[in-house]
Amino acid sequence: VVDDSLTVRELERKLLSNCGYQVVVAVDGMDGWNAVRTEQFDLVITDIDMPRMDGIELVSLIRQAPNLQSLPVMIVSYKDREEDRQRGLDAGADYYFTKSSFHDESLLQAVTDLIGAA
């Protein structure tokens, strides 16, 4: 889970942990990028607006890295305009959720669709 908001990071971490997933958190895109290059993950969930590296750049770097191209990526962002959603999907995100219409069940269903149940 990559998000500069402690509240959002903890919410997503607890939601996934309570379902049996092992969760690692990163405070921004740069920390997320360093983590995915050095550890093995089944899924990345990232915000867009973050310091040092935004989520779009993180998704793009993941999609450009030969050893990470198949890593599923979800964006969960406050940006709710259609052009923001399209930008995230064009960068290579598998799912794009807005925090304003965020539902735990939707996120968990998307995680299950991408990597299966914990």
Question: PLM ranges: what are they?
Answer:
Residues E10-N18:
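Charged docking surfaces used in two-component/phosphorelay signaling
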Residues G20-V27, A35:
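Short hydrophobic/Thr-rich beta-strand motif most characteristic of the beta2 strand and flanking loop
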